[in-house]
């Protein structure tokens, strides 16, 4: 079996011009930057950061964000180099297919489906939670949770997913415009939070900055990290007692808040819909990532300075709005709650786009049924977009948030690891390819990035790893029963095209 067969870059780019499976190029670097900010400034700023401070790192969650930001910022450069060479839908899946082979590409594609399916479901679920919270703060007697006997369903995720699915069916540019307007308003709310929050900061809340490590069972509200199955894998493997705070807490906090930095890899899935992608994709990814890191660092300082991490740990589900409520600024909590509702909505749209483009790329290659990659009159895979929207909505409506969120991180980190490893491989394999952006320090920096990403994976829970392995087993079953035998590369369906045709596919 030819498990490591690879596609050439020329084949990959030429496929973008296939009739009936062509995406429309209408996005600019600014659209990509806003897209990255839209998907990243949401759950991380408004919820995950406060939870990481409460149950993992205390005020040192600032360091957790810094570690996650540095690792992610380094990984973004790997994505930027690949995206400037291969501006095609599929992101890490496509990059891997041209470097280390089909079986690894399948693993990454399957992991990306996990990442974006779980992320889309988590965020749309959070959107419903915070919509109800906003209505409560405003004094409105309304609720999106419906009960039929012992059967419970939250209709809010279904509503928000249906709305953005409809927009994306009618064109990526339309969705990007709506998303952009909402994101600008969201950024304004974030900076409002930072400015107002500084007036409530107390230096005493930063002491101790790194709380001493202690058994998780002794910390009020930390039941989620006390069990064997919920402790970080490396603690389980080394026989350590489940603990929070201290250096282990900073590292596990970094693994948790990494969820906040997943935006740029979703942006890379839109390369095929970008004008002048060799230049605009690296620029859009870089600008977006810089904005994200700055905003997260500022909000982390304000959140931990306003309220003691111990007080946050006493809350069932601490968030940024919780911090303002605890200092008596209920009026600010209402504004923040509105910002959360608005902010999480934009995240849903970008994740729906990214998930669809991953499945689209795998379908076009034949690893998934080819019918999924057909595009309509608007230059979008309309039928696939509707199917993806339906699946995300159903998962969000019926599954618990806690089960889903860590799965996002492990899927993302596994993709980051392989993309980093692929950089030096592609440098040696195809030194002739033009690169609008080059990752500095290859091969050593990409290797260090891969190691750092894998270390963050080891800080995720044992249960997350078990679920991840089960997901991979299901993926291998699909690949060996269908994907391998229907892959266009294996069937000889892919043909090289003249360089003129390739240029037309890229720039047209």
Describe each model-derived feature in a short phrase.
Residues 1-48, 54-59, 72-77, 86-89, ...:
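Membrane-interface "cap" regions at the ends of multi-pass membrane proteins
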Residues 53-54, 63-64, 73-161, 166-169, ...:
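Hydrophobic transmembrane alpha-helices that form the core helical bundles
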Residues 94-95, 101, 132-142, 213-245, ...:
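TM-loop-TM module centered on a large, flexible mid-protein loop between adjacent transmembrane helices
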Residues 129-136, 185-235, 301-307, 416-433, ...:
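Hydrophobic alpha-helical segments and their helix-loop junctions in multi-pass secondary transporters
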Residues 149-152, 164, 371-382, 416-465, ...:
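C-terminal membrane-solvent junction of multi-pass transporters and transport-like membrane proteins
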Residues 152-216, 285-289, 408-418, 445, ...:
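Membrane-interface loop-to-helix entry segments
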Residues 189-196, 351, 359, 408-435, ...:
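Hydrophobic alpha-helical segments of multi-pass membrane transport proteins
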Residues 201, 406-407, 411-412, 441-508:
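A generic transmembrane alpha-helix motif of multi-pass inner-membrane proteins
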């Amino acid at each position: 079996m030819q498990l490591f067969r690879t596609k050439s870059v020329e084949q990959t780019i030429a496929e973008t011009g296939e009739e009936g499976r062509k995406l429309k190029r209408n996005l600019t670097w600014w659209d990509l930057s806003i897209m990255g900010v839209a998907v990243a400034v949401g759950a991380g700023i408004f919820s995950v950061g406060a939870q990481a401070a409460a149950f993992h790192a205390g005020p040192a969650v600032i360091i957790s964000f810094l570690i996650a930001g540095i690792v992610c910022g380094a990984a973004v450069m790997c994505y930027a180099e690949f995206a400037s060479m291969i501006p095609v839908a599929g992101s890490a899946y496509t990059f891997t297919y041209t470097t280390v082979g089909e079986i690894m590409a399948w693993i990454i594609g399957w992991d990306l489906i996990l990442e974006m399916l779980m992320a889309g479901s988590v965020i749309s679920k959070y959107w419903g939670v915070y919509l109800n919270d906003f209505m409560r703060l405003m004094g409105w007697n309304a609720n999106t949770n419906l009960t039929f006997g012992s059967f419970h369903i939250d209709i809010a995720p279904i509503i928000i997913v249906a709305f953005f699915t409809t927009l994306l069916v009618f064109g990526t540019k339309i969705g990007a415009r709506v998303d952009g307007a909402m994101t600008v308003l969201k950024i304004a709310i974030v900076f409002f939070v930072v400015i107002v929050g500084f007036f409530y900061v107390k230096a005493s809340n930063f002491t101790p900055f790194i709380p001493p490590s202690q058994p998780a069972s002794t910390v009020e509200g930390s039941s989620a990290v006390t069990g064997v199955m919920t402790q970080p894998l490396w603690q389980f493997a080394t026989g350590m007692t489940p603990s929070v705070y201290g250096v282990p807490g900073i590292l596990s906090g970094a693994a948790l808040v990494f969820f906040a930095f997943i935006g740029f890899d979703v942006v890379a899935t839109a390369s095929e819909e970008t004008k002048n992608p060799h230049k605009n994709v690296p620029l859009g990814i870089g600008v977006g990532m810089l904005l994200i890191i700055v905003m997260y660092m500022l909000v982390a300082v304000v959140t931990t300075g306003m309220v003691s991490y111990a007080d946050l740990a006493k809350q069932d589900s601490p968030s940024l709005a919780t911090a303002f409520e605890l200092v008596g600024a209920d009026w600010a909590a209402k504004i923040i709650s509105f910002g959360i509702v608005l902010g999480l909505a934009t995240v849903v749209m970008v994740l729906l786009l990214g998930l669809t483009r991953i499945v689209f790329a795998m379908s076009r290659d034949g690893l998934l049924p080819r019918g999924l990659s057909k595009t309509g009159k608007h230059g979008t895979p309309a039928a696939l977009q509707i199917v993806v929207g339906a699946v995300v909505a159903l998962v969000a409506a019926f599954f618990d948030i806690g089960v889903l969120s860590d799965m996002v991180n492990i899927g993302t980190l596994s993709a980051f690891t392989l993309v980093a490893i692929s950089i030096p491989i592609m440098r040696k394999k195809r030194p002739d390819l033009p690169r609008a952006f080059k990752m500095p320090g290859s091969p050593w920096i990409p290797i260090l990035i891969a190691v750092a990403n894998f270390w963050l994976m080891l800080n995720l829970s044992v249960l997350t790893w078990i679920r991840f392995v089960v997901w991979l087993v299901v993926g291998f079953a699909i690949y060996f029963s269908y994907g391998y035998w229907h892959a266009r590369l294996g069937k000889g369906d892919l043909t090289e095209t003249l360089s003129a045709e390739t240029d037309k596919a890229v720039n047209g």
